């Protein structure tokens, strides 16, 4: 639970820092509507892609995980309707940013539901498809 709280706090502080860098009010609440099945599906797909990439790449070359994460998140920005948050902590923090990147607080539970579904599917796919031991 400490790890989860640290992630949420770090994401919120990051949003506030971004506001300060762009001379925006530090404390905001998003009004950017991101509701509906397409957004939830997009977050599920983005989270699946991110976690499966981590699990896949780490089986062969652990040091390649950071660039793989960067590539999946960058690509997900372009190929998902939600712009690929892929992390509940980010979804919570983006509810505190009334910018294009923001998400209305009422829409956050749908994002998190999609992310949980994507995470569970990525885990199941990794168990079914990937070797159990690290490959060299």
Indicate residue ranges for each PLM-predicted region.
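Membrane-interface helix-loop junctions and terminal tails of multi-pass membrane proteins
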Residues: 1-136
């Amino acid at each position: 639970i400490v790890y989860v709280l640290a992630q949420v706090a770090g994401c919120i502080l990051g949003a506030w820092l971004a506001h300060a860098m762009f001379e925006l009010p530090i404390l905001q609440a998003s009004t950017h509507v991101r509701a509906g099945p397409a957004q939830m599906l997009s977050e599920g797909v983005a989270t699946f892609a991110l976690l499966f990439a981590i699990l896949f790449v780490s089986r062969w070359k652990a040091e390649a995980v950071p660039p793989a994460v960067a590539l999946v998140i960058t690509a997900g920005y372009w190929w998902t309707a939600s712009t690929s948050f892929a992390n509940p902590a980010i979804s919570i923090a983006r509810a505190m940013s009334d910018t294009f990147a923001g998400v209305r607080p009422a829409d956050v539970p749908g994002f998190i539901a999609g992310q949980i579904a994507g995470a569970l599917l990525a885990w199941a796919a990794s168990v079914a498809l990937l070797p159990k031991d690290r490959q060299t």
